[in-house]
Curated annotation (Swiss-Prot):
Cell location: Cytoplasm
Residues engaged in binding ATP 2: G610, P611, T612, G613, V614, G615, K616, T617
Protein name: Chaperone protein ClpB
Entry's free-text remark on domains: The Clp repeat (R) domain probably functions as a substrate-discriminating domain, recruiting aggregated proteins to the ClpB hexamer and/or stabilizing bound proteins. The NBD2 domain is responsible for oligomerization, whereas the NBD1 domain stabilizes the hexamer probably in an ATP-dependent manner. The movement of the coiled-coil domain is essential for ClpB ability to rescue proteins from an aggregated state, probably by pulling apart large aggregated proteins, which are bound between the coiled-coils motifs of adjacent ClpB subunits in the functional hexamer.
Molecular functions (GO terms): ATP binding; ATP hydrolysis activity
Region span, Repeat 2: 84-148
Region (Repeat 1): 6-71
Keyword check for Coiled coil: yes
Family membership: Belongs to the ClpA/ClpB family.
Domain of life of the native organism: Bacteria
């Protein structure tokens, strides 16, 4: 007997057997050591064969370990002289005899077990016979497993039963009810069946955007095959999905991956068309396993695909199909494309209705139909970079998950009561140490209060536990219904009519009644007194959308409505003297939040015109602060940086092949990260005219395609463009208001193209600041300075004389409010800073800033 032709698994087992003998202190490697290692190989042949005989590999392993425990042991270092025992040599000889009979080249682990059961003489064979293992049955299952092949190399394990190892049986999953129902994809499933039924090139490839339901179509086909709702051509066929990850994992040596793939393909081929192979992300096969001089996986598939020996369904996205499969013309012609389009909102609602039961069962909650409609419509409108129905299903799943967590967590009311009790207990312990009368009186009052609070807490807790148990019971009944529906479908497939009738008209009817009564019981509790909510509503979906995108799509609360109605007044406190401009901006935002604006355009597009320093940029800042509670929550793009025609690439991202392609554009990336935002394009007349072309689609369609070809959604942005065009006309006192408007309009038409001006919602003229409003502006600027001083521990007030002085000295009709800001900064700011630096003040001190004898002074 030669020991040079052992399979890698048997080599590994013998090596481990030697290590095991040394560890246990046994003087020799016995047949028990070898069999223990052979039986404990998780992906070995022996456990697989025993399982196929409907026996437990675990019981055989335990029996072997018991026999090992009775082996003699020696003390000291045994590693030097551990050799094979007589029983081990006999076992290997018996295995070699079996190998010769089966005409195998290599000695494998299955030969070891066959050799033991055929020619073994020890107690282990007797034990195995008691456990039900017989030689002729073992030989029969071994030959069946090999499918007429002999062992010609050292890794047969990777090639036997390759389908079971490297693919998942979708038919089995469908029978067990583990696949989600597939709704509204009949046309695509029919087209797939049509291609599969061809004589040659019967390989459909499903092409569609990520998340449109390509894999779901194959799962739908598996369901239809199991239910027998398919043409004769593919009736009783078995659908397997290839697990490329497990095929590549552990393929250490060159050619091992190809061996495994070849074995799997041969198994599919030998099934005579009974197996249909589904390869998800089929583009991963192109280049898989292609090391130096080796074929890649796709080239191994080509001959079988062309001859019709392999029926295969592929699935990939359009981008990857173009990148990998279209490049390889020979591979492309062997596949027949089936395009899977994104479903409409109405179709998505139908799909969600079909899936609703599964999600209700998993999370143990109820999903209202209005929530399904909201998930489809809101995801379509606000989540633009993903596809239906995937994004709508995700919304339902996350809202349900949030609801489940809330049911399992302590309700807010109960949590508050618990914290109050803890606080009172701490106070009680502190009062017990006090001896005065007031403390003793307070302790008595506190004891009564604590007793009431604890009683209230126990009542609330009992209510919570009761509601939880009722919701839990609902989940339990639904699980029972699902289980019996699967049993009914299985019985129907087997033709057990009596069993079907027993389940359908007996058990399911009873469970349905039980479910209705449990629902009624839960509804009896007043909704106002309920601690737990177990229904996912439209509002819950809207909250999840808001959390994902930052866009406020949930129903407006009373406080927000009042805030929006007062929007104009709030803005007037920040920007003085531009009431007309503020009214137009407020109206646009109110229209959008009330839901009556055009949903396919930005919230509002405004062109602010006027001389410098009149409040154009300040209005944008005030609006950002009002909408987002943060003055910095706006994307400001200074158009003076875009004077060259090529600088448009900085806004939308460099095209492929240029430096900076991966970085994206300043504008598009800002909006992708924050879809609900304010974008300020400052001083647009300074930009190159070419740059305005990108504004056309933003202002009209509310979208822009960036350098990577992605659509960026501007529908939830407020766009403000500022310009100084015609500022000398608006600042002049020579013209009337009507003349100013007409002259500025003429200037605009000269500078901007008609298609650009036509897309702007409102052109808002900011008029020069008059001396009547300069006092109010001075008040705002001084208040800002007062706040800064307060942060440094100084409480400042300003006299009317000072206010009169800065208003007169800082007013300049030509330059607006900026000279006033500079004057306050220079004179009042300097006076305060000198006072602080002199160290004359104490923290929290009150000082007054006055104007006396032509000087700004600080008075304590």
């Amino acid at each position: 007997m030669k020991l040079d032709k052992l399979t890698s698994k048997l080599n590994e087992a013998i090596y481990n057997a030697q290590a095991s003998a040394e560890k246990l202190g046994n003087p020799e490697i016995s047949e028990e050591h070898i069999l223990k290692e052979v039986l404990s190989q998780p992906d070995g042949l022996v456990p697989l064969l025993i399982s196929k005989l409907n026996l437990s590999p675990k019981s055989f392993l335990e029996s072997t370990e018991n026999a090992l425990g009775k082996q003699p042991k020696v003390g000291g270092n045994t590693s030097a002289d551990v050799g094979f025992s007589r029983s081990a040599v006999s076992l290997l000889k018996a295995a070699d005899e079996v190998r010769k009979e089966l005409k195998d080249e290599y000695l494998s682990t299955d030969h070891i077990l066959l050799g033991l059961m055929k020619n073994g003489t020890g107690s282990l064979k007797t034990e195995f016979l008691k456990l039900g293992l017989e030689y002729h049955k073992l030989l029969k299952i071994t030959l069946e497993n090999r499918k007429g092949k002999t062992i010609m190399d050292d890794s047969p394990e990777g090639k036997t039963d390759a389908l079971a190892k490297y693919a998942k049986n979708l038919n089995e999953l469908a029978k067990q009810g583990k696949l989600d129902p597939v709704i509204g994809r009949d046309e695509e499933i029919r087209r797939t069946i049509q291609v599969l039924s061809r004589r040659t090139k019967n390989n459909p490839v499903l092409i569609g955007e990520p998340g449109v339901g390509k894999t779901a179509i194959v799962e739908g086909l598996a369901n239809k095959i199991v239910q027998g709702e398919v043409p004769e051509g593919i009736k009783n066929k078995t659908l397997y999905t290839l697990d490329l990850g497990s095929m590549i994992a552990g393929a250490k040596y060159r050619g091992e991956f190809e061996d495994r793939l070849k074995a799997l393909l041969d198994e599919v081929k030998s099934s005579d068309g009974e197996v249909i192979l589904f390869i998800d992300e089929i583009h991963t096969l192109v280049g898989a396993g292609a090391t130096e001089g080796a074929l890649d996986a796709s080239n191994m598939l080509k001959p079988m695909l062309a001859r019709g020996e392999l029926r295969c369904i592929g699935a990939t996205t359009l981008k990857e199909y173009q990148k990998y499969i279209e490049k390889d013309a020979a591979l492309e012609r062997r596949f027949q494309p089936v395009y899977v389009k994104e479903p409409s909102v109405e179709e998505t609602v139908t799909i969600l209705r079909g899936l609703k039961g599964r999600y209700e069962l998993h999370h143990g909650i109820r999903i209202l139909d209005s929530a399904l409609i909201a998930a489809a419509t809101l995801s379509n409108r606000y989540i633009s970079d993903r596809f239906l129905p995937d994004k709508a299903v995700d919304l339902i799943d996350e809202a349900s998950s949030k609801m489940r967590i809330e049911i399992d967590s302590m309700p807010e009311e109960l949590d508050r009561a618990n914290k109050r009790i803890q606080s009172l207990k701490i106070e009680r312990e502190a009062l017990k140490k006090e001896q005065d009368t007031a403390s003793k009186e307070r302790l008595k009052t506190l004891e009564r209060d604590l007793s009431e609070q604890e009683q209230n807490f126990q009542t609330l807790k009992a209510r919570w536990d009761l509601e939880k148990s009722k919701i839990g019971r609902l989940k339990q009944i639904k699980e029972e219904i699902e289980k019996y529906k699967n049993l009914e479908a299985e019985a129907e497939r087997r033709g057990e009519i009596n069993r079907v009738a027993e389940i359908r008209y007996g058990k399911l009817v009873d469970l349905q009644k039980e479910l209705e009564s449990a629902n009624e019981e839960l509804k009896k509790q007043e909704s106002a007194s309920r601690l737990l909510k177990e229904e996912v509503s439209e509002e819950d979906i809207a909250n999840i959308v808001s959390r994902w995108t930052g866009i406020p799509v949930s129903k407006m609360l009373q406080g927000e409505r009042a805030k929006l109605l007062l929007m104009e007044d709030v803005l007037k406190t920040k920007v003085i003297g531009q009431d007309h401009a503020l009214r137009l901006v407020s109206e646009a935002v109110q229209r959008s939040r009330a839901g009556i604006a055009d949903p396919n355009r930005p919230i509002g597009t405004f062109l602010f015109l006027g001389p410098t320093g009149v409040g154009k940029t300040e209005t944008a800042k005030a609006l950002a602060e009002f909408l987002f509670d943060d003055v910095n929550a706006m994307t400001r793009i200074d158009m003076s940086e875009y004077m060259e025609a090529h600088s448009v690439a900085r806004l939308i991202g460099a095209p492929p092949g240029y430096v900076g392609y991966d970085e994206g554009g300043q504008l598009t990336e800002a909006v992708r990260r924050r879809p609900y935002s304010l974008i300020l394009f400052d001083e647009i007349e300074k930009a190159n005219p070419e740059v305005f072309n990108i504004f056309l689609q933003i202002l009209d369609e509310g979208r822009l395609t960036d350098g990577k070809g992605r659509n960026v959604d501007f529908k939830n942005t407020v766009i403000i463009l500022t310009s100084n065009i015609g500022s000398e006309i608006l600042g002049s006192s020579e013209y009337t208001s009507e003349e100013k408007e007409r002259l500025v309009e003429q200037r605009l038409k000269k500078h901007f193209k008609p298609e650009f001006l036509n897309r702007i919602d409102e052109v808002i003229l900011f008029h020069s600041i008059t001396d009547s409003v300069i006092h109010k502006i001075a008040d705002i600027q001084l208040e800002g300075l007062r706040q800064k001083a307060k942060e440094n521990g100084l409480d400042v007030s300003f006299t009317n004389e000072l206010k009169d002085y800065v208003s007169k000295a800082g007013f300049d009709a030509e330059y607006g409010a900026r000279p006033l800001k500079r004057l306050i900064q220079r004179e009042v700011g300097n006076a305060l800073s000198r006072y602080i630096l002199d160290g004359k003040f104490t923290n929290g001190q009150n000082v007054t800033v006055d104007y006396r004898q032509g000087k700004v002074v600080v008075v304590v």
